[in-house]
Amino acid sequence: MAGGKRALARLEREMVACLTEACATAQGEIVGFAWLTHQVDLDDFPASLRITWVFTDDTDKARALAGTDKARMIALTAQALSDAGIELDHVAWHVRFDSEEACWRDHGGDWNRRLR
């Protein structure tokens, strides 16, 4: 089991590196996109994997989700995961969208609490 845990931790580090590249790409392409993060329980991987794309405000988030940017973010996520050696049947099930504005409004800016 320890070897399995180490392998999963290594896989997560690779995933973070690939998602960082996806984030940088999106920041140059998608208006209002700020950053992304992920949560995962390695004991329930990959089912527990959740990737959250964060916008500066609700307006930019709504605009992105109404247009082609949503598909672009899902495609960037799928490519990043694939580059890390992670293949999921339904990448979109693991992707969420949020905004800094909503976090401040609903959770006082506490992302740890919001993402639980």
Language-model-detected regions and their locations in the chain:
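Intrinsically disordered, low-complexity linkers and terminal regions
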Residues: L8, R13-E14, T59, R72, ...
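Charged low-complexity stretches with an acidic bias
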Residues: G67-H94
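Short edge beta-strands and adjacent turn/loop segments
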Residues: G28-T56
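A short interface-forming secondary-structure element
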Residues: T52-A71
